[in-house]
Amino acid sequence: MRLTWPGHACVLLEGSQRVLIDPYVLNGTIPKDPDLVVLTHGHFDHFGETLTLDAPTVAVNDLAKALSALGMQATGLNFGGSITINGVTVSLTPAVHSVSMLELDGTKIMCGEAAGVVIRMDGVTVYHAGDTALFSDMRLIGELYHPDVALLPIGGRFTMDSAAAMMAAAYIGAPMVIPIHYNTWPAIEQDADAFKEAIERTTDMQVMVLPSGGSIEI
């Protein structure tokens, strides 16, 4: 599987399918023609280009219902639920974050709670924490899903910061960690290289700090 970080919280997974998570970047290009879009929640910096992409979408149930009402092919999940679409299994996990609201087609809608997602494709399991604070049940996410890669926000202010994300990485126990949701704006500036050094100095985990648009094979 190839993992690409276009920027912010947006991640593209390419294997037997093209799965795009949270299609928003501030300055850059959103990958086109995904087979599946997965949303962690409805805040603008995660919902992004969902309507323009017009691809099958998986989201928390409230948001999926709103998208379905607009004629999109959207599938809803709730915490603990999973669905498999064309060989890609998406599971919804809790996150600790605020409820989101969007204005779609001139109507303001409540988009439900924020979530994390676990995506399994081609024998690889990726956990995208979404926007979240640190919470102790991240240990259960590690025990239940055994992710190969954990995508963790480190920006602070609106999510956990790099120090809390270090604890999250230890709770989850994925062998590879990739920081996301940082340095998009001054309010969420963090030193990702220092985050990498601190984790790799004290654990056996590998931290991959990707440039915007950067990719790795996992």
Curated annotation (Swiss-Prot):
Q: Which HAMAP family match?
A: UPF0173 (MF_00457)
**What is the name of this protein?**
UPF0173 metal-dependent hydrolase Mpal_1063
Q: Which residues cross the membrane?
A: none
Q: Which Pfam families match?
A: Lactamase_B_3
| UniProt keyword Electron transport present | no
What family is reported? Belongs to the UPF0173 family.
Recite the UniProt keywords alphabetically: Hydrolase
Keyword Metal-binding recorded:
no
> InterPro entries of this UniProt entry?
Metallo-B-lactamas, RibonucZ/Hydroxyglut_hydro, UPF0173, UPF0173_UPF0282_UlaG_hydrolase
Q: Which SMART domains match?
A: Lactamase_B (SM00849)
Single GO molecular function: hydrolase activity
